[in-house]
């Protein structure tokens, strides 16, 4: 049995287009994961992704995770309140094109609905441009959180492509 998924590709081409969402609480801070910690990325990927059918990395070995995250063009940031983990984003920089892909982005379930998503996405976009990108892009789909697309659009990103894909039912 299979179904269909709507996938949207979004971009923002200037930091001036960003509609920034301010930090909802003063105790929040963003931390670059350095050195890379594949266990942390793996944790976020599995915890956030389990409700949204993130499956492409489920078969990755620890070596796959480590190799990917130790690439010089991959960066991970974690949002924390005090020492509690809230969410994360992964960036892949394509230096030859001066582009950055926000490859993965998400908030842990217990923090959804508390206004962290808009702030975290604002920070992801700003960090992407701070590294010299001329274009930041992301893709989302109808399996992602119901407010994911709205968040991207609310931050000033524009849809540049859509597609429908067939997926096997869970």
Cite the ranges covered by each PLM segment.
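Short amphipathic alpha-helix that is part of the acyltransferase structural core
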Residues: 22-57
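Acyl-donor-binding surface of acyltransferase catalytic domains
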Residues: 1-29, 34
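Conserved acetyl-CoA-binding loop of GNAT-fold acetyltransferases
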Residues: 151-162
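Short acidic/polar active-site loop segments enriched in Thr and Asp
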Residues: 75, 134, 158
């Amino acid at each position: 049995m299979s179904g269909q998924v709507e996938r949207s590709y979004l971009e923002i081409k200037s930091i001036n287009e960003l509609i920034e969402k301010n930090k909802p609480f003063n105790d929040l801070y963003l931390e670059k994961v350095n050195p890379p910690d594949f266990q942390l990325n793996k944790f976020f990927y599995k915890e956030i992704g389990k409700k949204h059918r993130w499956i492409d990395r489920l078969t990755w070995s620890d070596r796959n995770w480590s190799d990917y995250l130790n690439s010089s063009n991959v960066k991970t940031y974690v949002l924390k309140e005090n020492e509690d983990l809230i969410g994360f984003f992964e960036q892949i920089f394509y230096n030859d094109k001066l582009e950055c892909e926000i490859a993965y982005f998400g908030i842990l379930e217990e923090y959804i609905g508390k206004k962290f998503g808009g702030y975290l996405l604002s920070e992801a976009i700003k960090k992407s441009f701070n590294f010299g990108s001329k274009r930041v892009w992301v893709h989302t789909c109808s399996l992602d959180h119901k407010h994911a697309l709205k968040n991207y659009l609310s931050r000033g990103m524009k849809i540049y492509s859509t597609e429908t894909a067939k997926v096997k039912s869970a």
